[in-house]
Amino acid sequence: MTRALDAAGADGFCVATLDEAIALREAGIEKPILVLFPIPPEVAREARRRSIAVTASDRRLLDGLLAATGAEPDAPVLEVQLELETGLGRGGFGAGDAWQAASDVSSAPGVRLAGAWTHLQAPGDDGRTAAQVAAFERISGDLAARGIAVGRRHLAASGSLVLGEAVSLDGVRPGLATYGLVPDELLGRAAPNGLRPVLSLHARPVRVADLPAGTGISYGPSFTTARPSRIATLPLGYADGWARALSNRAEALVRGGRVPLVGNVAMDAVMADVTDVPGEPVGVHDEFVLIGQQGDAVITAADVAAARDTNSWEVVTTIAARVPRVYHAASVPRETRTLVGDEVGRRSARA
């Protein structure tokens, strides 16, 4: 996905961890990368070596970063961005300590103040968002008034973008929107945006069996057949990101119709009751869609999120690395990536 965004003209990328940033560098991404969450000061050398910007969100972390970079005065400059606390309550420098932090970064050897950012708590709450934007502008404006070159300022993410109300400043950080998805709480409120989902989740059965009435399905069991039933076993379980909370609460699409997923979700499998699917009996060559569209039927990430009492972010980001990714361009499959980098050992479930 990053390569596609790179080719489309993204100015840079934000990630959560240094490992993710390194993975992008090793994949050939040369544009700026910012790690949003704290890194241990002892690995600051690796960030400097790979030209990866890091975030300082509190005094202890900043002091550690400055000490680590000061010990290597001849190494490449480490870019640091400050997280500002504007109301999320998760981290960042507030109005009382932001100036000292920015001043220390600006005057330290081997370090450059490259930006400041915050994160909006509830983009759909106009009053709360306005207060956070005002706090951010006030803190960053005070730094500029006192002679600090703040660098790139950014606070808007997917929610602001799809509402058409993004305070872009010097950049925006679309996350869920890069999947073509609208944040759950903004469904129905989003401005026209041309987004369409680009992620779908598919599986083919590894077994389809006719079972008698009274058969318990999966561990527990939490589901027992009340009639002779045809049950398909799909090779997708909670180790793949299909949460156990979806047990007996989700559906799949097959041949353009909905079928219930029955029994407790196992580590590596979930079962579908295909007894009522019309036509020839469902077999191992039938394709099931767990997220996405088949014919006129659709199961969205938000549908799955509602079934497991979470949000779409958790649904799409917890699909495990062992689920093969099939990348498309203009609706044509172009590349399949697995844990071993190609189609060797490919499983029957895919995203």
Task: Describe the predicted segments one by one.
Residues 1-155:
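Active-site-proximal beta-alpha core segment in soluble small-molecule metabolic enzymes
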Residues 19-20, 39, 57-64, 130-351:
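Active-site anion/phosphate-binding pocket segments in diverse small-molecule metabolic enzymes
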